[in-house]
Amino acid sequence: KVHGSLARAGK
């Protein structure tokens, strides 16, 4: 999913 990408960059 897309949220995985932002989650990795966010943390």
Curated annotation (Swiss-Prot):
Q: Which GO terms describe its cellular component?
A: ribonucleoprotein complex; ribosome
In its UniProt record, which GO terms are filed under biological process? defense response to Gram-positive bacterium
Per the record, the domain of life is Eukaryota
UniProt entry keywords in alphabetical sequence: Antibiotic, Antimicrobial, Ribonucleoprotein, Ribosomal protein
Keyword Secreted included in the entry's annotation:
no
Specify whether Hydrolase is a keyword of the entry.
no
- Which residues does UniProt assign to the signal peptide? none
Protein family per UniProt: Belongs to the eukaryotic ribosomal protein eS30 family.
Q: What does this protein do?
A: Has antibacterial activity against Gram-positive bacteria.
Q: What is this protein called?
A: Small ribosomal subunit protein eS30
Q: Which organism is it from?
A: Oncorhynchus mykiss
Encoding gene (name): fau
